Amino acid sequence: MTQTTDETVPALDLSDFDDTVRVQDDLYRHVNGAWAERTEIPEDKPMVGAFVELRDAAEAAVRDIITTVEPGAPGSEAQKIADLYASFMDADAVEAAGATPLAEPLAAIAAVGTVDELVGLVGRHTRQGVRGLFDIEAESDPGNPDRYVMFVGQGGLGLPDEEYYRLPAYADIRTAYRTHVAGSLALAGFSDAEAQADAVLELETAIAACHWDKVRTRDLRAMYNLMPLADFEASAPGLPFATWLAGLGMSEEAAGELVVTQPSFFTDVAGLLTEDRLPAWRSWAAWSLVSSRSPYLASAFVQERFGFYGTVLSGTPVLKERWKRGVDLVEGALGEVVGKVYVERHFSPVAKDRMDTLVANLIEAYRRSISDLAWMTEETKARALDKLGKFRTKIGFPTQWRDYSTLEIVPGDLLGNVARATEFELQRSIAKIGAPIDREEWLMTPQTVNAYYHPLRNEIVFPAAILQPPFFNEHADDAVNYGGIGAVIGHEIGHGFDDQGSTCDGDGRLQNWWTDADREAFEERTKVLVAQYDALSPVQTPDMHVNGSLTIGENIGDLGGLSIAHLAHHIAQEGREPEAIEGFTAEQRLFLSWAAVWQTKARDELVRQRLATDPHSPAEFRCNQIVRNVDAFYAAFDVRASDELWLEEDQRVSIW
């Protein structure tokens, strides 16, 4: 039986509002200020807010599914769920095992005597879910988006990003990281853990120096380097890539052509793969193994890992309960099995119908907006409209569910189950290489509170779990839904026309469909938006700024999303003027709903980490900086030059 939105859930929760803050000065804190004042971040979380609360609800729903699933025959999907969860929840068995599960793989690392053996071992580790030196996935070929091709990219780091290894601002984190590495290796039985940790940090610093930075990796053209395997191997002498493939369980023939996303990384890392560095590489491999396995080992390992990744990096003081971590494991390994039941219990057909209408109106709003753009030539408009017409939309859940029949889950074998689940997913990915694209595949489960745009498939996807308040409320007025899920839809469509998506055509092919003049006009507008965000500093971290170049794609998505949602709401009204509700006009309610979506309270440590690594701007700016660029917001609330949110008209950015 599907569940619909509770009719008692308010469309706008006025108890969250802070009327001491004028909407014209700070929309975000006007709508969320009272909520922020009374809300404490749970001790097992780095943040709380609209997204987190929905994720908590989804987590509880998944736990209910896992713990109430009817036992099935051995090997059935139901039994796999039960056995995997039980293997994690048997804390006594995990504690009794201690560090013993690490003994055999650590001995294999210690026995490595050549670079070739090392690279083969790293390949095997990658296959089994251990952090590796390279990332690998099968994805649409940007030059021929009807087929899958193998992508390989940079990896090998235990810190969040390459800049953590080089910038003075992260010196304290580097010290804490070294202490964590030493502590983990000591738990694993290393008597020289301090020296091993020094070797790990030194080697990872060298690996980080080979990495492309975050902004450079946003350039899809620079990242698309299709080449035969032989050419790739010739470009990175000293890197026995075929040995790594063999470790993965993949032949050179199966790899065929591949896309090398950061070619210089492989060339430079090959220079680090020398016999004299083997001791350091063994230390790094041991650390990667221990770190990756720690969440599934005895509590001393779990707490050691959480102390750094949870507390130092994110500020979270307390590890979340074991059942929540068990749910995470099942979600990662058997997500679509759980998703089938989640949809049956929690997805309303009414939501699907209203979403279809919302999407249709957002598409029409984009069509009208593109047609009326003054800065774009008719030639490029025609191609933009062609791309818009080819958008594919997926709502709620997949029409074809993933087949887990070959995934073996063994009762009581937690680490084995983790390794087999990772290997199953890797082999499923590798098997796609060279095959036609599966257009029905989803890259998120229905119980995921998120949405995405895929530039190489030109599709927007909205899982069932995001179709809940404050994003979507089937009992709410249109204005609230257009300011919430409507802007999310517009945001995802907008990614098709952001700095990355605009380099792909309607078929997902990496191809320039712009005139030079139009591309220049587009980039002039995006430069202004980059500069706006570069100037912003969160209240919590005034010593740090938003990286406008890193966040430009999401900022374009937000700006287009809200602007087009506003237009789509007008289309939906068909000339009618909606009545005011709770003292607010429909125009005002749309913008108030937009602000409610970004309701967030985060720990300082997490804010700092996200400013350094996240392509999304902080919530307060996703709300406030966007409305400063939207003329309709000024009209809705009579914003004037003396108000804090005022932005001079010639400084406002309008792209789509």
Question: Model-predicted segments: where are they?
Answer:
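Intrinsically disordered, low-complexity linker/terminal regions across diverse proteins
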Residues: 2-5, 235-239, 259, 263, ...
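Short, solvent-exposed loop/turn and secondary-structure capping segments
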Residues: 38-42, 137, 161-163, 211-213, ...
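Hydrophobic/aromatic-rich, well-ordered segments within soluble, folded domains that form packed cores
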Residues: 16-37, 164-186, 552, 558-564
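Conserved phosphate-chemistry cores used by DNA topoisomerases
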Residues: 11-14
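Short secondary-structure subsegments characteristic of cysteine-rich extracellular domains
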Residues: 43-66, 193-210, 481-487, 582, ...
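Active-site-surrounding "flap" and adjacent substrate/cofactor-binding loops of secreted or lumenal enzymes
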Residues: 5-8, 19-26, 30-93
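Noncatalytic, helix-rich "gating/capping" subdomain that lines the substrate-entry/channel surface
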Residues: 67-357, 361
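Extracellular/periplasmic catalytic domains that process cell-envelope and extracellular macromolecules
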Residues: 19-23, 142-144, 453-456, 583-585
